């Protein structure tokens, strides 16, 4: 239309009055400018269309400038110029990349042989022996560089080659999960190695992995692993949604993630399983649970989680089922004793001493008659001192920690009894209670807190306070539910099938059904 307007004006200019010549001249100039603009717009749209069709990224010099601005004052950011028939720029983070891999996977393929004529030739050379990605935008470039990739770019294209350095420690037995029999491999801080340890045990295409990134600055990789033929889809979706909703600067360990995927942030008892052993994680996945591998952490999270799992040990499934059952009963009794012994000692001395046999009562009275503190203050003092020694032992080196424990337990205890500050029965009760806590190491802190609270209530209300405290705790545990799983299953609600691996452990030969307390698609264990 602009061409027709200009042609019409040029042909009719001599036939018009002179007064209209100025107006038509202005219109002609406007039409010519519109013609030029239309031509330029056509070129622009053709270039945009070409970019969409070819997928190429133009103006790589702008990307290089943006990288230099982003990593300004960062000596770790490195650029190199390579000429292989066409000028190329290599960009990478020196601390994340291996010089040997850059030489073998990037520089040598580019400079070896004939000169490259185009970028497609460069791609073919680089893809023969390395993992290669093509960033779609500037944010993808930043992401691959942060993961140890080397970005190769010319004026119009870019490609990234995996040259990350390997910083993984040896696979050893976890110090917190040692066993007499069974596998001794443990997870390490590298997420891909941990995923390999799981895949080595689950050689099936049903093992699915969803990759997520968490943390504004750390951009930590999280692998959500599950068996698609066993795990319930609604549980998997809920776990993925909980991880995707996390908004935090950084995730440095799996314990960060456990606080976010636990829906009840104020729960006293943890409701997310944690393990350092691949065989334990695989065993839980075979029951329908979801495992989460966090890069940088040797701990793997598992959900849903049952309280009865605290009584189970990794070595239980490699021992005789009779011995396993006895050990679990012993753990259960130890936990109850560690929580209730101090409170029962206090209430029986202060309020309900008539329940104690006469000879035992006389012995206790002879040991405590010169003590300046009340039984409540005496027991709380012992509990606090024991917790201080335990915390100091954790913070000190192993050799010093052993000496500190011996000095604290023997020297201080003996000196306090001889000085008449505390009684020998109270020291014995406090020691038994403290040792019993370590039969359930994952809940030591919360059990220690409950022990202190119940002891105080026993000193105020007597045996009635102990009974009421245990009822409140039991009701609280019964009300807990996470990811469609009751926390106290298989006892409340009662599930007879699940009791084969609760406190008593039946033979593996009799395990025919998967736990009903864990949502799953396939209830049969025997390959069906």
What are these regions (language model features)?
Residues 2, 6, 17, 21, ...:
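Membrane-embedded alpha-helical signal segments
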Residues 344, 360, 369-528:
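Generic detector of multi-pass transmembrane helix bundles and their immediately adjacent loops
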Residues 323-340, 367, 371-375, 407, ...:
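Loop-to-transmembrane-helix entry motif
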Residues 319, 323-326, 367, 393, ...:
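Membrane-interfacial loop-to-transmembrane-helix junctions in polytopic alpha-helical membrane proteins
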């Amino acid at each position: 239309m602009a061409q027709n307007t200009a042609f019409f004006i040029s042909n009719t200019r001599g036939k018009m009055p002179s007064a209209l010549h100025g107006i038509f001249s202005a219109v002609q100039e406007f039409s010519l400018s519109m013609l030029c603009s239309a031509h330029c717009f056509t070129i622009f749209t053709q270039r945009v269309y070409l970019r969409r069709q070819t997928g190429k990224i133009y103006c790589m010099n702008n990307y290089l400038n943006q990288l230099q601005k982003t990593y300004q004052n960062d000596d770790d950011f490195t650029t190199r110029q390579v000429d292989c028939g066409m000028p190329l720029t290599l960009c990478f983070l020196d601390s994340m990349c291996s010089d040997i891999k850059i030489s073998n996977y990037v520089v040598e393929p580019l400079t070896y042989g004939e000169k490259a004529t185009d970028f497609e030739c460069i791609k073919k050379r680089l893809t023969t022996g390395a993992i290669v990605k093509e960033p779609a935008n500037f944010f993808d470039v930043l992401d691959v560089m942060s993961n140890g990739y080397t970005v190769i770019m010319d004026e119009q294209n870019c490609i990234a080659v995996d040259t990350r350095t390997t910083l993984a420690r040896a696979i050893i037995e976890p110090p917190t999960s040692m066993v007499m029999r069974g596998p001794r491999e443990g997870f390490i801080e590298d997420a891909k190695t941990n995923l390999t340890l799981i895949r080595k045990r689950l050689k099936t295409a049903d093992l699915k992995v969803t990759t997520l990134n968490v943390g504004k600055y750390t951009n930590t990789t999280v692998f959500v692993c599950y068996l698609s033929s066993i795990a319930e889809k609604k549980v998997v979706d809920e776990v993925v949604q909980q991880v995707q909703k996390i908004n935090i600067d950084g995730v440095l360990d799996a314990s960060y993630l456990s606080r976010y995927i636990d829906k009840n942030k104020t729960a006293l008892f943890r409701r997310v399983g944690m393990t350092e052993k691949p065989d334990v994680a695989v065993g839980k996945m075979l029951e329908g649970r979801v495992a989460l591998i966090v890069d940088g952490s040797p701990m793997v999270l598992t959900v849903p989680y049952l309280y009865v799992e605290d009584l189970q040990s990794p070595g239980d499934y490699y021992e005789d089922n009779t011995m396993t059952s006895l050990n679990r009963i012993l753990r259960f009794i130890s936990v109850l004793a560690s929580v209730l012994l101090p409170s029962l000692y206090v209430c029986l001395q202060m309020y309900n001493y008539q329940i104690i046999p006469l000879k035992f009562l006389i012995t206790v009275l002879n040991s405590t008659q010169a003590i300046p503190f009340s039984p409540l203050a005496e027991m709380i003092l012992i509990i606090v001192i024991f917790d201080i020694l335990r915390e100091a032992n954790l913070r000190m080196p192993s050799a010093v920690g052993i000496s500190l424990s011996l000095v604290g337990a023997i020297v201080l205890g003996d000196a306090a009894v001889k000085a008449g500050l505390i009684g020998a029965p109270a020291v014995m009760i406090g020691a038994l209670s403290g040792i019993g806590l370590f039969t359930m190491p994952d809940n030591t802190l919360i059990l220690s807190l409950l022990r202190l609270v119940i002891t105080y209530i026993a000193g105020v209300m007597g045996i009635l306070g102990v009974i009421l405290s245990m009822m409140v705790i039991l009701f609280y545990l019964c009300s807990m539910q996470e990811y469609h799983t009751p926390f106290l299953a298989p006892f409340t609600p009662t599930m007879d099938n699940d009791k084969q691996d609760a406190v008593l452990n039946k033979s593996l030969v009799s395990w025919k059904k998967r736990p009903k307390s864990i949502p799953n698609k396939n209830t049969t264990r025997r390959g069906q």
